[in-house]
Amino acid sequence: RHNPILLTDGYKPSHHKQYPPEVTHTFAFLESRGGPFDQTTFFGLQYLLKAYLAELTITLEDVDEAYAFFAEYFQNPTIFNREGWEYIVREHAGKLPLEVRAVPEGQRIPIKNALLTVTNTDPKVPWLPGYFEPLFVQLWYPISVATQSRAMKDIILANLQETGTPELIPYKLHDFGLRGVSSIETAQIGGAAHLLNLGIFEYPPQRREPAAQPAHGAGRNKQHDQQQHHARHGQLNAA
């Protein structure tokens, strides 16, 4: 089990001292500022929340552990917000008073738009949304994988539609990420993000008639007949 209080950057525990006393709420958001694609595919939030935040309860033992850690880290026992975390344990039974809103997972969103927002629901903990910023930024990885995988799928699917076998799209872009990432968990997260695009062809899946002939090995002079066949079966423009 992870101690949620330790899932942050080293300097974050000092930020509670920097908010003006009249501040009661803060509002944080995550967006894609830009990149090679004009849209991002949002994915990974549900796993992050369930694994690290929503289903965990902060205990006094967690607070004691974090206090000891940051007292040594800062060489100062007064930096860590022990009072604030004990308040969460006492008044919220260890549950984080945060409200997280997000676009639906799997949805493509134009860049420079908010993908998720985080705010505190208790006016006594305005420092809390920013405290977990580093954890929410972990979403960069599943979002990046899902976005790039979707872009690759679009390119492959366009060519499959031209050559007559778009129903083969689930088998045209394979995931070999396990051997190239830093941990088993990273591979699981990246694999799930890729599976979002290529694991199932349609939502919900629909039964299709098999193609009359395979596309592989067909020359350009055979493509017209194949396209006519699939157009008659409603497969040419499948997405």
Over which residues does each language-model region extend?
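An acidic, glycine-rich surface segment that forms the CoA-thioester-binding/catalytic face
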Residues: 69, 74-78, 82-89, 93-99
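Low-complexity, highly charged intrinsically disordered N-terminal segments
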Residues: 26-81
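Exposed alpha-helical structural elements
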Residues: 44-48, 52, 62-69, 83-87, ...
